[in-house]
Amino acid sequence: MKLKYCGLHQQEDVEVAAASHCDYMGFVLANSKRKVALPDVAQWLATTDMSTKQTVALFVNESLDTIAQVASSDLFDVIQLHGTETPAFLQAVKDRTQKQVWKAIHHSSSALGIMQAFAGIADGYVIDCKSAKGWGGTGESFDWKQIPSYKEEGVRQGTQVLIAGGITPENVVELARYQVDGLDVSSGIEENGKKSVAKIARLEQEAGVHYARNNTR
């Protein structure tokens, strides 16, 4: 199971995530309280051991030129599109940047159909909760009973599917029985606006223990 810690927006966050067991470190380059500036990210990463991590740049309905400009910095391994971008736009981003591109899809009755439209184009998916509060990082979760449908579609496409939205150390155990490809966590590992070492440690312990047990059945 992969772990992605998103919404890193200060040096301390980067250091905490880099010292954790996460696989991906996410940075928001869209309008958000966690939005970061490229020069700051460059400075943070330059002083951090990133040898075992991959970086993800998150955009929401951004222009192709801006995404390409950010990608050319070579600070990021993955581009994540978190808005209403089309399959054609995602393909254009891939062609222009030569990066892995993930598509975030907000859970709804039409979400599976949207996911199917990106088959053969998206390199991965993040299934998030649809919320009036924002595109992501709201702390709200969707009905996890729907996860198997997304997992099945991910298997059919041969792509990984990460689950996002309202995941915390207290409820991560509930995800164990779904054996998801990965978790995308932001507000659930924060305290006073910063990524919390204690919350990350607890989440990793809970997820690790219960996923190990589940996978031995």
UniProtKB/Swiss-Prot annotation:
GO molecular function: phosphoribosylanthranilate isomerase activity
Listed InterPro entries: Aldolase_TIM, PRAI_dom, RibuloseP-bd_barrel, TrpF_fam
Catalyzed reaction equations: N-(5-phospho-beta-D-ribosyl)anthranilate = 1-(2-carboxyphenylamino)-1-deoxy-D-ribulose 5-phosphate
EC number assigned by the record: 5.3.1.24
Keywords noted in UniProt: Amino-acid biosynthesis, Aromatic amino acid biosynthesis, Isomerase, Tryptophan biosynthesis
Isomerase as UniProt keyword: yes
Known pathway: Amino-acid biosynthesis; L-tryptophan biosynthesis; L-tryptophan from chorismate: step 3/5
Record bears the keyword Cytoplasm: no
Domain of life: Bacteria
GO biological process, one term: L-tryptophan biosynthetic process
Pfam family, one: PRAI
Family to which this protein belongs: Belongs to the TrpF family.
HAMAP family (alphabetical): PRAI
Name of the molecule in the record: N-(5'-phosphoribosyl)anthranilate isomerase
Organism: Shouchella clausii (strain KSM-K16)
Gene name per UniProt: trpF
